[in-house]
Structure formats: C-alpha cells, structure tokens
Amino acid sequence: MPTEARDNNRHIHLGKVRDPHHQHAQRFCSNRISTCKYNGFSFLPRFLYEQFRRYNNIFFLAIALLQQIPDVSPTGRYTTAVPFLIILSVSALKEIFEDVKRRRSDNKVNAFSVEILVDGHWIEKQWKDVSVGDFIRIDNDSLFPADLLLLASSEQQGMAYIETSNLDGETNLKIKQALDITSTMTSPEKLSQFESEITCEPPSRHVNEFNGNIEINGVARHFGIDQLLLRGARLKNTAWIFGAVIYTGHDSKLLMNSKRAPLKSGTIDVQTNYRIIFLFFVLVALALISATGSEIWRGNNIPQAWYLSFLEHDPKGSFLWGVLTFFILYNNLIPISLQVTLEVVRFFQAIYINNDIEMYDVNSDSCAIARTSNLNEELGQVKFIMSDKTGTLTRNVMKFKRLSIGSRNYGNNEDDEFADASLIEDYRQGDEHSTSILEVLKMMAVCHTVVPENKDGQLIYQSSSPDEAALVRGAASQSVSFHTRQPQKVICNVFGEDETIEILDVIDFTSDRKRMSVIVRDGAGGDIKLYTKGADTVIFERLEHGKEQEEAVEYCTEHLEDYASFGYRTLCFSMRHLTEQEYSQWAPEYKKAILAIDNRAKLLADAAEKLERNMILVGATAIEDKLQEWVPETIQALMAADIRVWMLTGDKRETAINIAHSCALCHTNTELLIVDKTTYEETYQKLEQFVARAIELEKQEKGFAMVIDGKSLLHALTGEARKHFGDLALRCHAVVCCRMSPMQKAEVVEMVRKLAKHVVLAIGDGANDVAMIQAANVGVGISGEEGLQAASASDYAIPRFHFLRRLLLVHGAWNHDRSVKVILYSFYKNICLYIIELWFAMFSAWSGQTIFERWTIGMFNVIFTAWPPVVLGLFDHPVPAEQIMKYPALYASFQNRAFSIGNFSLWIGLAIVHSLSLFFLTYATMEHQVVWDNGLTGGWLMLGNCAYTFVVATVCFKALLECDSWTWPVVVACIGSIGLWIVFVIVYSLVFPHIGGIGADMAGMAAIMMSSYTFWLALLFIPLATLLWDLVIKSLFTIAMPTPRELAVMYNKRTTSFNGFERLASYSSNVLENMRLLTSSLRGSTTGSTRSRTASEASLALAEQTRYGFAFSQDESSAVAQTELIRNVDSTREKPTGR
C-alpha cells in the first residue's frame, strides 16, 4: 500500500497486500476527476458571487431592502423582493441543470474501465477506483488512467509505443522503455511477487521532467521521463504494458496543466453592467430632481394652503425621505426581468444548438452540445480562433500518395491511397527507370525503424513515425513487402521472392541533419549500399555532379512543386554504392564516434558527412497528413468572416507549417516570419525586426504570417519582448505556434484576450488543450473522438471541426443579434412605462404618488411584456442560415451592429419620446375626465390604467417592428400580450377586490374603461402615432445603414436591380461602400478547393519549404535510439501474453 510522503518527495510501497480502506490510501489524491463549477458546499456562495457580479442584481437587492422601511415605498414592500427571488431561483435551476450535464460527462470519464492486479489476478475496475501504488494492465489502443511507471511490456526489452498527440499534439509515437530489472515481470504471477519502494519527486506540471528511484532487494535504480507514462496518452502498437500508479487524479501532470472551470461571463453581460450603471446614475439624478421639485412645491404651497399645514412638520416630507421615495418609485427603469429573460432565452438557444441536425456526425453518432448557455452571444463576436492541430484539423492518419522517379510522376490526388498500376508495369517491362523503381521501393521497405508483426495472418507495422509506417505500407502495396526484422537483418518479399538484406549500420535521423541513412548489404555477399532519405535541401546538395543528376533534380523539383501545391509532406531518396574498402575504412571511425563521450554529436556528424556524399537521386515521395473533413473550406469561410485563425500545437515546426498550407491557413504567397531563437536578446531583436517588416508588408498589402516555437515563446511572453510579440501577432493574418506546452497555449490565449480586447475562441480535442479552452472567452471541444477531457472542459462541444462554421456563422450571429435585441428591448419597455411616473409627478405635486396600481407595476415585466422579448430571442431570423453559410462576410456585419453606445442611446431616446407621447396624448384625451355620455369621470387610476394599456400595446407593436422575420410565435406573443392585459383587467377588477381586499382600487375598473368609446379609439390611435417616430427612423436607416439581411437580399437580386441600387446609394456613400465591401467579400468567400493553385504559387510553396525544411515525423528524443531499436528487435520471437 502507498505510504505517506515523509518529506517533499513521494514514497510509494509496491507489492504489499493492499487494503483500499486503509487510512494511508487517503493520503494521495483520488483518481476521480471533476470539471464541474459547483459542489454541494460551494454552490450557494459561488452562485451568489456569480449573480451579484451583475450590478442589476445588487441594485434590486438594495431596492428590496429599502422597501422594507415602513411608509417609504409608494409601491408596497414585496413588489421587488418576490420577483427578485423568482429570478434568482430560475437562474439557480439553470446553473444546476448545466452543472449536472458536466457531472455526467465527468462520470463518463471516471467510469472508463481498467484492469488492476488484485491477489494475483487482473480485475476490471473503473478509472476512479485507481489508487497510487496499484499495478495496472493497459492493452493496445487504450488510454492511461493515471501517471504510471512502466514496469514491463509485450515488446522486447520492455519497449512500448506511446501516442501523446492528446497531450502535446505531436503526431509521431514516443518509445518508452522499462528498466531491465522490471522488464522481465511479464506475467501477473511474477508481478504479484514483486516488492519494492519508489521514491520520486512530488507532483508537478512539467511534462518533460521526472526523476525517481526504485529500490529492489536493497539496490536502488534511477528512473526518469523515459519510464513515465502520462495520463491521457495512449498505448499504440504494443499489445500490453504493466505499470505502477505514481500520480492520480489532479496530481497527474495532465490535470496539473489544467485549471478549474472558470466562471465566464460574456462581453454583452459586461456591457450590460455598464449600461445599468449609467441608468443607475440617471435614476439617482431623477430621484434628486423629483425630491427637489417636492421641496420647491412644498415651500410654495404649504404656507398658502391652511389645509396642508399638517404637512409642515411631517418627517416624511424631508428631502432625504423624498429621495428614497422617488428612488423606489423610479427603480423599475432598470428592468428586473432582464436577467431571467436572458436566462430563459439562452437556455432555449442552447437547446437549438443541441438539436441542430446540421451539426450531427453520423460516424461518431454525436451532435453539438452546449455545455453552458451564458456565452451564446459570444459565438457571434469571435475575432480570434486558437486551434489545436492534431485531431482537430488533422486526423493523424498518413497516406502514401505520390511517387517521383526520374521524369515519371506516379499516383494521383483523387485516390485515398497510392494507386498507379503503371509503376509496376514500367518495372516489369524494363523501363529506363526500372532500376530506380526497384531501389526506391526497397529503400521505402528498409530505411526505417518500423517493426513488423504478423497478427492473424496480417502484417501490422509498429512505428514511432507515422510517416515511416505509411512508406512501408506504400512499398508493400507495390509488391515490396517488409515482413521480418532481426537484429542484423531484415527480410522483404520483393515481387514474390524473399530477399534478406543485412543492416550494417544506421545513421540516426535528427532535426539538424534532416535525414536518416542505413548501410546495407544486398543479399549474401552482395553489394554494399548507402540508402539515405531526407529533405530535398539536404539531399540535393549531396548528389554527385553531372548532367544526369542535374536533369534528375530538375524533374524532381517540378514534381515537388506539384506536391507542395497540395500540402503533402515530401521526402527525397538517394543512394550510393560503396566498395568493401570504402566501408571498412569508414566503419571503425563511425563506431568510435558512437562510443565517444566528449564531442559525440560532432564526431557522429563528421563521420556521416564523409559517407553521405556523391549520391544519386533515386526518387521522392509525397505523404498526405489527412485533414479532417472540410477543414480548408471551413477556415476559408471563417477568414472571410473577418476572423483570424491561429494554430497552436505541440508538434514540430515543419509539420505545423505544412498543415498550415494544406488547410488554407497560409497560402503559397504568404510570407512566413519565423521566430526560432533561444535567448531573450535574440528573440527580442527578431521580433523588433519582424514588426518593422510587418508594417512594410501591410503598406504593400501582402499577406504574412508568424511562426514561433515554444522556446522562443518563453522569451516572447516576458519583459519588453511581450509588447513586440503582441504587436506582431495582432498584425499577422495567421499565426502558427509550435512545440508548445499546454500552459503556453493558455498564456497565448490570455495575452491575445488582453491585448486585442476581442472575443477569443479556443478549439481542441485533447487533454493538452484544456488549459487554453478554459482560458479563452469561448472554449470549444471536439467530442467525436475518444478521450473526453477537452469536451468535458469546454463551453461547447462539436463532433468535427467543420461544424464550427455553422456554430459561429449561424448560431453565433443569430444569438448575438437576438440577445442584443432582448436587452435593448427590455431597457426600452421599462423606460417607456416607468418614466411616465416622472411626467405624472409634475402633475401630482411631486408627491411620490404612483399613477399605476401597485401590483400591475410589478407584473408589467413578469407577465404582460414577458413574452415579446423571449420570442424575439428565440424565433427572430435576422438572416437565413443558408445565406450566411454561403456568404460568411455577413458575420462581420453582425458584429458592426454590436451593443454600441450609439445603438443603446437610440433605443433609450426613443423610449423617452414614446413615454412623452403616451402620457401626454393620454392626458390630453382625458384632460377633463369627461369620457362617458352621461358625464361621469374616472379619476387618476383611470388615467393610469389607460396609459398602461397604451404602453403595453405600443411596446408589443414595437417588438413586431424590430423583428426581422415575422414567425407565428412572434405574432402570437405580441398580440397575445395585449389580450392578456385586457383579460387581466377584467378578472382583477371583478374578482380580486372581493378576495381579501386585494386590489381594492381596481374594483369596477374594467367596466369603467371598456364602456368608453374614447378608450377604444385612443387604443387604436395613440400607439400608432407613437410608433411613427420608429417608422421614419427605420426607413432612414434602411437607406443609410442597411442590415445584413437587407444587404444579402440586395446582393441576391443584383442581376435585376443592382443598377437601381447604385442610383439609390448615390444618396448615401456609406451604403455604397458597405455594398462594395460585402459584394467583394461574398465573391471571395465562395468555397472551393483550396488546392487549385497556379504553378507560380506552387513554386513559391516549394521555395518556402526549401527554406524551412520538410515535414518528416520522427521521434529523435526517444528512450530507445534508432540504432538500438533496430539492433534489439527480433520480430520472429513469440511475445508474452501478460496473462
């Protein structure tokens, strides 16, 4: 059982009888994970904290408390408290519902199964039951549930292939190797007899650092990162491994690089807070003005009117008392229902997202999931997208596609795999290139570190490099099949006959060399050959001189241009025949370099240089790193929508640049500004230089992108360099950040958020993306693949990257436009009604008397005008989905209609004008209170109820006026709300006064109002007269600043009416400019294949690749060197079962 940590290090006993209920088992972190925002203890304080970050909630709490002061409130004691409690309850239920969804997602991960050794037998348990010190078995293609110490594996020498793309984004597999003293424990019986003590460093977030000792029989052995298997990584090409659990749950390196789910609030919420602060000061000013008016009126009238003398010494007539009274009277200028209306609207908007059949993926049987609804509007304001590469943009599937040999360019781009029968035909017919065909296929089958495995009669290739595996499979498809590896030789089936090829030496691949070589003896006593594969830049300069090779390079270059235009990963193959004497002279020098301690790297490089020269070019290959479906088209559409896309990946620079081109993030004429320095001073100077270059390119209107690696980023994010980095990054059309740690991704996201002050969206599929997903304004996880960490930590989950286009362009644009209307409309209708109290105060001696019945004041928001903003937020379609998907430029025009101060001021101004119109027209209509044929009058409440009715009608018609598409729910809600008020007046005035005296003032009011023809005429005339202002303004805005919907409609009709529109636009240069921009953008955003590029563009692409290397994926920091791997593997040995 594990013991407690006796010092800063962690001490773990292995192999003793384990009692899961023992107290020591509780000293380490549980393996249960949680991404929930709340728990049973934190819900109330955290929920209240989140709610009272909204200033309107603080305001209404204060009003509810003030109303409890006796006689200070003209509207009653509970007219604010009751609605406020209802609103908080609705918000709490919504938060609980969404957090339950997160908990279910966590439980899905916690319930993954794993085999744990118990009493010498493998017992299947859940991930959450894994404890420190457990022995566990992981089978091929399974995820590691915790950080493990590798003890043994099914492979020779205790080796295991690990896929870490979920952690660092790298496509190549890592090779881990168990210590020799534990690698022999290949059965549960041996493992159950094993006993030792582990001492290792405490949990840390450094994924590339780990040290510890394991003590067996009194002898301590050191282990390190080469023996550590991280949670979230996946076992590949290895039947099984045994591991000892070192770190669990939130102590694991993966989760230490993640953050607790943050409390995110949208930009609109922040802006709404500022608007509420503004209205609060307006409210205070009105209260002070009204209290001052009261003081003036009292001073002028009380001394002259003997019947008012009792008010002279009344404490309730003080200025402060008046301020409080008017403050409460006008408090509804700030809409109490705004938050609950938004909560309801956002909740159902999230349901729309969840049920959008257009975002359903058949292959993974998964759909889009809105894990929070608070950020729906943020989807419509995105300016930056930070995307992971591996698994998000790419499938991490390599396909051998093309082959260049001499003047022949074999293969095509349409087939999924290499398919060209003419290759074999040319070889069999003795074509002039037949020798090269045979040699390049043999090189593809021999020059690598792949290990073959015969499983059920089928060859399976295990490789740390997916590129190498793709080449070996490609050779096998062309009848040169590699099937056996032994320490000193490989056996290949070459066109039906087995050939044994002796491996004499291996010169390892490194990123500096950009090549790998093997020296082979072709058959018993055959020729010695040097096979070298690598980047075109390093291969071409090592070829022998002569016209023949110059022609070969010319043909190869032409083919490489073709491959570059499709974003393929290219590799050149060359060879050289060696004499026995040449090899025997060189081999001792190379072996001496291998054994050297000092200057080993230089000695190895010098030895390689002596041999890798005067070679002949055999051919070149093209490998496709397959993108996810519709990735180039999606990125094109997003960029057409004025969104900047960044790629943040842990993969190599060359691979990242290659994918940036193939997914249309960078084009072939995009100038790459590469920052790859190792010191702060160099990084600072390079950034400063590139800022000047960027300014120059902007003037020339040329495209440019920045590429920066993780080491340079460490310096770029510190000190004065941070300013230059931010300046350069925000100027670039695209940015590629490679070799990044999870926390660096998060730091970049946070930097862009602060500097750009725009909405940043982060999207990824792996556990290494969790930190940046949580750091972004909006986090999107890919849910279609196994490993749910990213999806669980995200705000929105989608099955595939290309669904991001619909999520932003359709749901984002719609939700943003709808929510802005909901907020503005809520402010508008409240000011429209409650500012009437100010106008009435002028005619009521500034007494603080309300013109409306007290309970109808509270019910205005929660009942009579509750539905129009809801249907506006759910059913309004500002632009049809088909149009905005076809013309992404419309998305940017929605952002131009943001929640601006100007737009807010317009709505507030109209609300004040409407309230003036409604009050004074109503007052004028009933000025002498003679509204019946018999001369009876109705009193002040009659005036208030009539004005109330006209306000309800006006704000409902206003909702119809602001709606871009009249659907039946919108019409029913608006007309129905007017009818609801009429019905309420009838019921309230006839029934409630007889139930405990509720609403006694309203007794008989329905009969009084509805028996007057003046009321019915005014109900028809006054709202229409009031809304004439809006009709005039909307007409002017349609001409001067048309909406995105209007622009799209005009664009669709351009063939018949565009000339007429041009003439109309002559009255407004603003419209003309908008139309030109939109038209050019729409024409430029039609999605087509990004791979239709000109020859000159392809040439530029090749030039870039020759400057920056190639995209060959090979792990050069493996626990097992390539030479050692080749020398230690014997694929003919039988593997242990581990059972």
Curated annotation (Swiss-Prot):
EC class name: translocase
InterPro entries assigned: ATPase_P-typ_cyto_dom_N, ATPase_P-typ_P_site, ATPase_P-typ_TM_dom_sf, ATPase_P-typ_transduc_dom_A_sf, HAD-like_sf, HAD_sf, P-type_ATPase_IV, P-type_ATPase_N
Annotated EC: 7.6.2.1
Active site: 388
One GO process term, biological-process aspect: phospholipid translocation
Pfam families hit by this protein: Cation_ATPase, PhoLip_ATPase_C, PhoLip_ATPase_N
Example of a GO cellular component annotation carried by this entry: cytoplasm
Transmembrane domains' residue ranges: 78-98, 276-296, 318-338, 831-851, 855-875, 901-921, 935-955, 972-992, 1013-1033
Gene null: resulting phenotype: Results in abnormal formation of intestinal vacuoles.
GO MF term list: ATP binding; ATP hydrolysis activity; ATPase-coupled intramembrane lipid transporter activity; magnesium ion binding; phosphatidylserine floppase activity
Chain segments annotated as coiled-coil in the UniProt record: none
Reaction equations catalysed: ATP + H2O + phospholipidSide 1 = ADP + phosphate + phospholipidSide 2; a 1,2-diacyl-sn-glycero-3-phospho-L-serine(out) + ATP + H2O = a 1,2-diacyl-sn-glycero-3-phospho-L-serine(in) + ADP + phosphate + H(+)
Membrane topology of this protein: Multi-pass membrane protein
Record flagged with keyword Nucleotidyltransferase: no
Localization per Swiss-Prot or TrEMBL: Cell membrane; Early endosome membrane; Recycling endosome membrane
Record keywords: ATP-binding, Cell membrane, Endosome, Magnesium, Membrane, Metal-binding, Nucleotide-binding, Translocase, Transmembrane, Transmembrane helix
Family: Belongs to the cation transport ATPase (P-type) (TC 3.A.3) family. Type IV subfamily.
PANTHER family: PHOSPHOLIPID-TRANSPORTING ATPASE (PTHR24092:SF150), PROBABLE PHOSPHOLIPID-TRANSPORTING ATPASE (PTHR24092)
Role played: Transports phosphatidylserine from the outer to the inner leaflet of the plasma membrane, thereby maintaining the enrichment of this phospholipid in the inner leaflet. Ectopic exposure of phosphatidylserine on the cell surface may result in removal of living cells by neighboring phagocytes. Regulation of the phosphatidylserine distribution in plasma membranes is likely to help in the maintenance and control of the membrane surface charge.
Protein name, UniProt field: Phospholipid-transporting ATPase tat-1
Upper taxonomic lineage: Eukaryota, Metazoa, Ecdysozoa, Nematoda, Chromadorea
Gene: tat-1
